[in-house]
Amino acid sequence: LARETGAEVVQVFISNPRAWSGPRLETAQAFGAEWREAAIGPLFVHAPYLVNIASPNPEFLSKSIELCRRSVAACGVIEAGGFVVHSGSGGEAEVADALDRSATVLQATLAETPDETQLLVELMAGTSGAVASTLGEARALFDAVDDERLGLVLDTCHLFATGYALDEPKGVDAMFEELRQLDLADRLRLIHMNDAKFERGSKRDRHEIVGEGGIGLEGFGAIVRQPEVRDLSVVVETPSSGERRRLELETIRSLAA
């Protein structure tokens, strides 16, 4: 599928994304062998949707920790470049408590993460209770974790839903300047390049095909021309597939040309 669409970077789930079952080691070993033989490019693994590293529910939090631990072990087997996990949501709990839980889980997961895989935290879409959606909140989380091995993932739809003006070149410039001022630019490891179905600041995480949503081609053109993005891995998580996905990737490449 990656070859059919012209993809050079791939992100996958290595277990059922809607279950706590976690990855099977023998399956990871088989996939890893096939992936290395394919020699397509960087590989990233996304945490299952159920994982919430800031959950105030002790049982849910314990399950999230265990699933992260098993997932990063499997990432080492398949030699994935990064394991992506959302910053988490504390619901109605105090923000400081949710931040502490998220940081503690990230620290514990880092201790289990193999050298060939980097733990990456993805900012959320400004939803209620989210630990980190803004760059300032990301800085607070990175300070709490206090580990240089932790990397950052930015999702363009999430940022737009949070309120960043990514539909305007000057808004894109301002966001990346904030990233630099907060000393987060050198922690950026991956971009999830998704357009947004809803308007800026909606706090709604619904992805749209690049160029067909609220951010638009002008916004994405400004994003891909940022120096931090030019040599960065980019993953598309939109509703496109097959030939439509191939054309979408070509559009993104043309914006960067």
PLM regions: where:
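Conserved, mostly hydrophobic/aromatic
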Residues: 2, 46, 64, 75, ...
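Non-cysteine beta-strand/loop elements that form the S-adenosyl-L-methionine
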Residues: 8-13, 43-45, 151-156, 185-197
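C-terminal helical cap(s) of enzyme catalytic domains, especially alpha/beta-barrels
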Residues: 243-257
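Gly/Pro-rich active-site loop or hairpin
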Residues: 96, 131-139, 160-231
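Active-site acidic/histidine proton-transfer and metal-coordination neighborhood
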Residues: 53-152
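Active-site beta-loop-alpha junctions enriched in small/polar residues
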Residues: 15-17, 48-50, 88-90, 122-128, ...
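Alpha-helix-loop-beta-strand connector modules within alpha/beta enzyme cores
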Residues: 27-45, 102-116, 139-146, 214-226
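N-terminal pre-domain/capping segments
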Residues: 1-47, 51-73, 257
